[in-house]
């Protein structure tokens, strides 16, 4: 989902596990709404920068353990997220902010170009694995590698995304 408003609608209609993939810059009102949602459902937010993670932690300090964080990885679309080799900076910001890091995610939007799904699927797999492996190597417990687009959903190798439906990520 892209907005807190979308999450509110889904939770109001029974969803109990939601992930806001669009980068948020959380203010006081958004923090209040996320806290209320976290009382009713499992909530995860994406972090694409160290600054964004720090802001999220500052705004949600009292609810940090109740809200999961996945770091957005740029797998070749170059729209948002960090390169796999930059993931540690964001992870440390997530940890310093007291947030609960559970994994990494990507959206291979470039897979929609003609003839690109196979190449984009491989880039997605490699980016998720490189980022997750770097985090695990320094002690971050990563339970989720989230990815997929319509063109790459069925192309993900066994060692790629652990899920394309957020519910499958362990907590």
Swiss-Prot record:
One of its GO terms (biological process) is D-serine catabolic process. GO terms for molecular function: D-serine ammonia-lyase activity. Transmembrane segments: none annotated. Pfam families: Ala_racemase_N. InterPro entries: Ala_racemase_N (IPR001608), D-amino_acid_metab_enzyme (IPR051466), PLP-binding_barrel (IPR029066). This is Uncharacterized protein Mb1448. It comes from Mycobacterium bovis (strain ATCC BAA-935 / AF2122/97).
């Amino acid at each position: 989902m892209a907005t807190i408003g979308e999450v509110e609608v889904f939770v109001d209609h029974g969803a109990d596990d939601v992930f806001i993939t669009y980068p948020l810059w959380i203010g006081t009102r958004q923090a209040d709404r996320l806290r209320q949602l976290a009382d009713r459902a499992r909530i995860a937010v994406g972090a694409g920068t160290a600054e964004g993670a720090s802001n999220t932690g500052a705004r949600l300090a009292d609810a940090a353990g109740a809200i999961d964080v996945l770091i957005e990885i740029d797998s070749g679309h170059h729209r948002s997220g960090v390169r796999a080799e930059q993931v540690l900076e964001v992870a440390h910001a997530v940890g310093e902010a007291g947030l609960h890091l559970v994994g990494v995610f990507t959206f291979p939007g470039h897979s929609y170009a003609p003839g690109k799904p196979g190449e984009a699927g491989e880039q997605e797999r490699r980016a998720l694995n490189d980022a997750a492996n770097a985090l695990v190597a320094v002690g971050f417990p990563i339970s989720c590698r989230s990815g997929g687009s319509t063109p790459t959903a069925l192309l993900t190798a066994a060692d790629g995304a652990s899920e394309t439906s957020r519910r499958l990520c362990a907590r």
